[in-house]
Amino acid sequence: MAPLNFDLSSVPDRKSWCAQLVGRQTSRKIISTSEQFRFCSSIIYDEEYLSSRKISIVQYLLHFLMDISIFFLLLCLLQTLSLSSSNTLDNLRGTSLSVEKPSDKLVSENGEFSAGFFPVGDNAFCFAIWLNKSSTPTVIWMANRDEPVNGRGSVLSILADGQLILTNSLGITIWTTKAADLTSLEPEVTNLQLQLQNTGNLVLHNSKDVVIWQSFDSPSDTLLPQQALTMMSSLISRKGQDDYSSGNYKLFFDNDNVLHLLFQGPTMSSLYWPDPWLEDPGQAGRSMYNTSRRALLHDSGYFESSDHFQFNATDFGVVTHRRLTLDPDGNLRLYSLQKMNVSWDWVVTWQAFSDPCRIHGICGPNSLCSYDPVSGRRCSCLQGFKLKDQTDWSYGCEPEFSIPCNHTDESSFVLLAHAEFYGSDIFFYQNVTFQFCQEQCLNRCDCNGFQYNYNEGSGYYNCYPRYLLMSNEWTPITKFCWRFLFKTTKSRYFS
C-alpha cells in the first residue's frame, strides 16, 4: 500500500499547524510553545529529502509522536517513584505501606520523626512513630502494641470511608481507627492524605486540611509538647524497656476530675497518685471542680492540668525535644533530649516519685520494697515466701507453707516493725486493743496479716486486718507507731 501523504501547501502556517498537533499531545504543558515550534521545525523541512527517502510527512509525525509518548511515560514513572519516597502519601485510597519494604515509611519534613513498621521482636512488627535524633530510636506511639504482626504480607492502608486499617498476612484486621463520616464533604475534597508532622503527630486529613484522625488523640505511653491529655485519652506504660506491650500503670482523669496514676496488677488495682491516704485531693493542691479534664505539656517544659496540678522542668526553656512518659516502673517522668559528647540522650528533668517504693505494685504481693539513692530500688520476698514469677516482680511472692483456716494453736504472727502494706483492708476497727485485732485476723481464713497503728490525731490505736499484703514501703527509720504482723505457722522458723 502506498504511504499516505498530506499536502501541507494548503496549510497557511505549517509551524502553527504542527504546534497545535503536538500541543494536543502535551496538554499537561510540560513542553512550552517555543519548544513545540522547535520540534515542528525539525520535522517540516526539505520535502525533497523526505521524498527521496520515500517517507511521508504523516509517517514522520507518527514516529515523532511515538517518541513523545515514550517520553511522557517515563516522566510519569519518575513522578510515581518520587511520590512513593516522600513523607506524605496523596490520594491514599487503595494505597498502603508494607512491612516487607523498610523504605515504606513516612518521614517528617524536618527529618526527625519517622512512622512505619518498627521491629519489636523476632519477626514481630508494630506500626509506630519514633524519634530519629536520639542515640537509639525512641518510640513515642504504637498502633498495635499488644498484637504485633509478622514480617510478611502485613500492610497499613487507607479505606475509602476514611479509616486507617492494619491487616496481617491473612488479611485479618489487627488495628483500625474509627470510621470517619465523610458524607457531608463534597466529592472533590474527600481525597485523603496521611502526613507525619514536625511535631510527631501523624495526621489523616482531606484536601481542605480537615482532620479525620490523628495520633495525638490516642497516645500510648508518651505525651509530646502540644499534645493534650483529655478525658477521652490516657497513658498506659509498657511492660519493660524492650517489651512494648501494655504494662500495669495508667495515667488518666478519673470521675472526680483529678489526674491520677493507677496500678492495674494481676490480682488487684489501686490508685497511688496523688497519695491515696489523703482524705481530699485538695490536700495535694488538686481541684475537683473543673470538669474540662485536660492537661498539656508546653515546649518550655511547663506542664499544667485542669485540676490545678502543674510543674516546670529543671531545664525550663526551649530545648530540642521533650517527652512525658509513664515508664514501666510506674513513675511519670519528663525527659529532655540533650547532647552528651557526640550523641543525643534523654535526661530526666522531672519525676512524680523520688522514692520508687511509694509506687504501688512495684514489688508485688507478699514482698518488701527498699530504696537507697545510691544502689536504687530492691525487692525481696517476706521470709518463708518465694518469688512467684522469676521474670516479673508484679506477681509478687507466694508462701512456702500452708496456713490452717480454722482458729488453732498452729497459727502465729511475725512482726515487721518498719513495713507498711497498703489497701486490701477487710475491716477497720478504731480504738481497739492489740489482742482484739489479732483475734479478728485469726478467726478469718482470708486474713493474711494486720496493721496495728497509733493515730496521733485521735489518740487511738487502729486495727486493719488485710487479705492481701501489697508492699508499699519499708524504711530503716523506726516508726514506733507502725506495726504490721503477717500470719504464718508456728512450725516455721524465722530469724
What role is predicted for each listed range?
Residues Q59-S495:
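Beta-rich ligand-binding surfaces for carbohydrates and other polyanions
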